[in-house]
């Protein structure tokens, strides 16, 4: 889990000082980091934060604490990208695999919960298991999120957005969520992620 999220989750944050305990203490360090960023970039620069609205693990951050944290950070952040999962549990670490039980748009429900609960005007974004334009449009049309983000879909097909805009969804080379791009982005592989469906992401045979 990344540094800021490790403070926000009660699973990873076991501190007993002012940076641990209740949600406000756990959000103290992230708020300090975001405030310093805001001070440096000014009010005219958009700041987006990736945020676990659910850890998918017993004892993880609650929906109530997640919403309260977003409101607490709302004066120093513009967009919250709602994701989920945890490396502390094998199931929670593989929830985005295509063969897993969670399906597509797996974090849209938590983004929707954040939109319902927060009192601030922070833009809520969802990410995870959204690899078709129609699904992205559905999530937005149903009001589950203000924005939709994706990453691996663009590794599979860098022209994803262009094809979607041209209404050629059938030509999109879909991400199959096999995680090869994640398991090969290591120094041993020259820091170049591979892709099962995109041969351009594979080093040429010598």
State where each predicted segment sits.
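Flavin-dependent oxidoreductase catalytic cores
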Residues: 1-206
